[in-house]
Amino acid sequence: MENKQTLDFEKICQWFKDGEKKRENWLIGTEHEKFLFNKNEFKRLSYEDLKGIKFILNKIAEEEDWEKISENNNLIGLKHKSGSSISLEPGGQFELSGAPLKNLHMTCNEAGLHLNLMKKISNELDFVMLGLGYDPISKRDQINWMPKNRYEIMKNHMPKVGNLGIDMMIRTCTIQVNLDYLDEKDMIKKFQTSLALQPVATALFSNSPFIEGKLSKYLSLRAYTWTDTDSKRSGFPDIVFSKDFGYEAWTEYLLSVPMYFIYDNGKYYDVAGKSFSKFMNGKLEGFEGKFPSLSDWEDHVTVAFPEVRLKQYLEMRGADGGPWNRICALPAFWVGLLYDQKSLDDSFHVAKKFMDVSLLKESRISAAKFGLNGIIGDSKIVDVAQDLLNISFEGLERRNFKDKNGISETQFLDPLLNILENGKTPADDLLKKFNGVWEKDIYKIFTISN
């Protein structure tokens, strides 16, 4: 926060332009989240438990050389010299934000190292990780909140703007990939393509069919939860498909997104529902004569939650959490579609007929409910998924990044190719086990590999 105006519309537009990178410098950043449960009682770990979240963070910091991140004397995250970090989602979900890396071999290896570290610690401390899109057993009031002030502000505001925002915060997990863009034209094409295709990713990665020990009626309950969270900051912004879309239009959209907080001198101030535009003009209620800094703008960008989000890179946000092979498969899917020019052209051609917000809203619910058997526009999602996997496979082949054994990045698409071959999403497989060998005992879910 500043005492004089240092930001204007042109400068915050420039911030997105400053994210442009030459093709040879494009990197891949992967983020993935896990639920942590006590192994004996199958309750979500709380922050202050004897061997809870804070204890785990301290153990990683002290034994594995991670730097601590604190807020109000509470340990809330870690960062590593490699560029990766560990942060806490509102209900104690562990999120690894991977370092930006050059190829999928590197990013998959990084995810594997993190999971192996967490498995080692989980065995020592008697907790279990679960890689799903939605907590399969816990009720809202059984989940403890993490001591982060921004979460307290969001917790208080969410019920005013939607029915499922609290569930989104504490009962969901996702896998995301962050990708670069060359210039404004490239950003536009990647943004429009990926936004129109998110329901396909939602279907392929659907992995959240349970709620509170029962069937949820959805294959991706996580995706459905987002449909009733906060319509002003989530979903499919129609501006993305407008003929004049670009950095300026995206900035206008973000200025229309209500604020949540201001962070200044180590303290969070609740400004939920207020206007960033007024803040820019020094007229924010309660903060008259104060103006945003660039870091205030960066914070504000993080409280928009569309299915694809532009920061200084593009975030793909439509997939459920899952195990290691799908943590590798999600970036592989999108890198194959967007990081090779022919693949981008081909996937844009596929996506073009879906670039309608009403259609996409319907398609997301269809994907969440029926997975590959859902509908996108006039097409079956399974058919579009097959076309996209073919395009992605060819794109990864043309990238021609091979590991030390000469194997290309296409190997990371294998879980998705198997899904299409069998016609069963991860959620379908869970339902088959639940209704079969598990004999409807939801606690058998803790035996699956994560």
Question: Predicted segment positions?
Answer:
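Terminal catalytic/cofactor-binding subdomain
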Residues: M1-N163, R171, S206, R326, ...
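Structured core elements
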Residues: F35, E95, Q176-D180, E315-R317
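Solvent-exposed residues in well-ordered beta-strands and their adjoining turns
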Residues: F37-K39, A99, D180-L182, A319, ...
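Loop-rich catalytic cores of soluble enzymes, especially ATP-dependent carboxylate-amine ligases
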Residues: N123-E124, M129-L130, Y134-R309
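Long, well-ordered mid-to-C-terminal structural blocks that present hydrophobic/aromatic surfaces
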Residues: K274-S358
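Charged, low-complexity interaction regions
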Residues: N400-K404
